[in-house]
């Protein structure tokens, strides 16, 4: 026990929130919403990013998807939704026949794909969430997206 009778009572109340205030939210999982994309039809390239606790987003953070074929055709997905939850969605809308991808391109996730882009991603304790993937395995587990003609 603590014999300090002058301890501030508010400290005891704050202990209930301690778990969410000690460390920043971390990315725990990343995945493609679909694993195939038809260039002739166009459509959305969506990424799901899961954190170990709910996060709040301001602005438009971005997610970089690399193109195995050519870095000049990497895809940048903008934040779409999920603030207040532990799952954020990033999206790139691609018009039919768009030159950003070619048939047989393989899109994949590499280390540290999230950039704040002048926005913020914060946990419930107001800590800036980590945008660093804690392991290359997180990106590898996301799989790939193959572009069709």
Please state what every model-predicted region is.
Residues 1-149:
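Non-catalytic beta-sheet/beta-sandwich ligand-binding modules that flank or precede catalytic cores
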